């Protein structure tokens, strides 16, 4: 019995550790998240747009920093201290979802940032058109371009990342990743 219990404890420990490796954040990030969620909990705001504006106001003093998601191996990066255009939108949208904990927030963020929620560099939604398409399929965003007067669709051809792998440390020297990016771009 003691052996079985020891194996179960070891299995739990290593499983937990493996999951923890795919998430990168600081204590400041989790505390900020909880502060935002607590504020929303005490709010009477039911309208999604008002909720997003309320969340976005928490980020007014945060600096713009590029490339905060880059690193090996690929992890779900939660950085609520520094943001770029896309990570700001992702953070606001994820915090505006019906989430009540840091774990809920990270799951919402993972779903927004990665194709089918798979945390891999080649499954990250690098292109904004791809991000809009994937999150539109899930009903999280809506492309209203066709509803705007005078708007015309533009042909879309994605190939920059697979054509310039030397510009991306995660692609440089990884032909299998470049091949996957080429598949993603062609889809």
Residues of each region from the PLM?
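Acidic/His-rich structured neighborhood in mature extracellular/periplasmic domains
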Residues: 62-187
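Cationic-aromatic interfacial patches
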Residues: 22-87
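Functionally constrained cores in energy, signaling, and assembly domains
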Residues: 7-10, 47, 96
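Serine/threonine-rich low-complexity intrinsically disordered regions
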Residues: 1, 22-29, 101, 157
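Bacterial Sec-dependent N-terminal signal peptides
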Residues: 1-24
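Compositionally biased, low-structure terminal segments
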Residues: 13-15, 33, 161
């Amino acid at each position: 019995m003691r052996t079985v219990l020891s194996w179960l404890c070891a299995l739990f420990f290593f499983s937990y550790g493996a999951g923890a490796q795919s998430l990168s954040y600081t204590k400041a990030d989790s505390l900020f998240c909880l502060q935002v969620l607590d504020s929303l909990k005490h709010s009477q705001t039911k309208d999604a747009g008002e909720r997003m504006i309320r969340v976005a106001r928490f980020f007014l003093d945060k600096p713009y920093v590029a490339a905060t998601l880059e690193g090996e191996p690929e992890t779900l990066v939660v950085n609520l201290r520094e943001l770029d255009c896309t990570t700001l939108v992702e953070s606001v949208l994820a915090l505006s979802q019906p989430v009540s904990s840091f774990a809920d927030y990270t799951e919402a963020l993972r779903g927004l940032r990665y194709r089918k929620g798979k945390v891999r560099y080649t499954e990250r939604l690098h292109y904004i058109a791809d991000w809009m398409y994937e999150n539109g399929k899930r009903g999280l965003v809506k492309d209203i371009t066709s509803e705007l007067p005078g708007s015309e669709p533009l042909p879309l051809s994605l190939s920059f990342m697979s054509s310039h792998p030397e510009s991306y440390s995660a692609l440089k020297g990884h032909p299998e990743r470049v091949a996957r990016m080429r598949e993603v771009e062609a889809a």
